[in-house]
Amino acid sequence: MFNNKNILVTGGTGSFGNLFVETILNKFKPKKLIIFSRDELKQSQMAQKFSSDKYKCMRYFVGDVRDLDRLTLAMQGVDYVIHAAALKQVNIAEYNPMECINTNIGGAENVVKAALSANVLKVIALSTDKASDPINLYGATKLTSDKIFISANN
C-alpha cells in the first residue's frame, strides 16, 4: 500500500508519528516520507534517529496545520496523508481553549482543504476514545474533527 508512495504525516514528531514512521520504514519502501510538524527540535532529533544516509525517503517540513498555505504547499505530490497533529493534553486544552479549537478543528478543516487542493489519494485521520462521548473540550474538538473528515468523504 505504501510502497513507492509519497506520504505526509502531520504531527509527525509526536508519539504516534514516531512509531508510525518507524513502522513504515521497517515494512514498506515509500518514495517520500514527509514529517510535517511545528517542532523543529523534534524534527532535528528524528533526522538523527532516521538518518538520511540510511533512509533516503525522509523529508522534514516545518509547518503548522493552522496554516493552510503552508500545509497546501507540503501536500503537493503527496499520495497519502496521515493526520496525527493535535493539541491533545486535556488540561492544557481546558486552559487554552482557542489553541485547542484552532489546532484540532481548524487544523482538520485545513487538512481537508489542502488534501482536496493537492489531489491527495487518501487521508487517514486519527481520533480518540474521548470523542465518542465528550466530557471535555479536547473530546469535543476531536468529535468535531471526526465530523469534518466524515463530511469531506461524502
Regions found by a protein language model. Give the residues of each.
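Conserved Rossmann-fold NAD(P)-dependent oxidoreductase catalytic core, especially the SDR/UDP-sugar
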Residues: 80-83, 87-147, 151-153
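Conserved Rossmann-fold cofactor-binding substructure of NAD(P)-dependent oxidoreductases
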Residues: 59-80
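Adenine-nucleotide cofactor-binding loop residues
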Residues: 41, 66, 88
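Conserved S-adenosyl-L-methionine
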Residues: 23-32, 119
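Conserved glycine-rich Rossmann-like NAD(P)H-binding loop of the short-chain dehydrogenase/reductase
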Residues: 28-45
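Short, conserved SAM-binding/catalytic segment
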Residues: 46-55
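N-terminal Rossmann NAD(P)H-binding glycine-rich loop of SDR-like oxidoreductase domains
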Residues: 5-26
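Conserved residues in the N-terminal Rossmann fold of short-chain dehydrogenase/reductase
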Residues: 37, 61-62, 102
